[in-house]
């Protein structure tokens, strides 16, 4: 059922992962106080305790608000100390990395995707789709929180493959 408190939470998680490119630890420790939806951004504390601001799209915002209003209110009642953590498990605690992995695999399987799907694939898709859409590599580096641009350049190989395919398909002497 797509309307259970867990299904709504899980959809919100999947939307946030794809919309923002967060690392799994950043996602599981995301705080409500760091959601700045009036400006379409979220504040992230990333690796090395570095802060960054990441834009977040309306679809993800809608699902997060739905989760907060329809699901989280029940989960937070069981919380002992995590009242600011956004995504909670059935005990009211922050989700574990493993729980997010299992949830990702579950929905991939339900969607008929049998290849190896894991949370980082959403971060990879986020970066790849931005670059394929023409985003500046430096801007993508900032959004991902990479200290070194060479780490971000890993995502450009897909873009190169795409460019080769376009060239092969459309250039008369390819």
Where on the chain are the PLM-derived regions?
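Conserved catalytic core of the tyrosine transesterase superfamily
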Residues: 1-174
